[in-house]
Amino acid sequence: MTIAFELSVFALITISFLLVIGVPVVLASPDGWSSSKNIVFSGASLWIGLVFLVGILNSLIS
């Protein structure tokens, strides 16, 4: 169970880093938002899911 928690925290940190770097780049590019809107929303949905997963796993571990 601890391994799953650690991997989900690592995935959350990785997705957070990618969103922090990627979203401003997408918004700054001239045609970026209209062509990459689905990717940004998918990343945000994945991030929200990982936040809930980390919270659930944390409550099971401690």
From Swiss-Prot:
Matches recorded under Pfam families: Ycf9
Localization per record: Plastid, Chloroplast thylakoid membrane
Function: May control the interaction of photosystem II (PSII) cores with the light-harvesting antenna, regulates electron flow through the 2 photosystem reaction centers. PSII is a light-driven water plastoquinone oxidoreductase, using light energy to abstract electrons from H(2)O, generating a proton gradient subsequently used for ATP formation.
Transmembrane segments: 8-28, 41-61
Main location: plastid
A single cellular component GO annotation: photosystem II reaction center
Coiled coil location: none
The keyword Membrane appears for this protein: yes
Topology in the lipid bilayer: Multi-pass membrane protein
Entry similarity comment: Belongs to the PsbZ family.
Keyword annotations of the record: Chloroplast, Membrane, Photosynthesis, Photosystem II, Plastid, Reaction center, Thylakoid, Transmembrane, Transmembrane helix
Protein known as: Photosystem II reaction center protein Z
NCBIfam families: PS_II_psbZ (TIGR03043)
Highest taxon, organism lineage: Eukaryota
One of the protein's GO biological processes: photosystem II stabilization
InterPro entries registered for this protein in UniProt: PSII_PsbZ, PSII_PsbZ_sf
Subunit structure: PSII is composed of 1 copy each of membrane proteins PsbA, PsbB, PsbC, PsbD, PsbE, PsbF, PsbH, PsbI, PsbJ, PsbK, PsbL, PsbM, PsbT, PsbY, PsbZ, Psb30/Ycf12, at least 3 peripheral proteins of the oxygen-evolving complex and a large number of cofactors. It forms dimeric complexes.
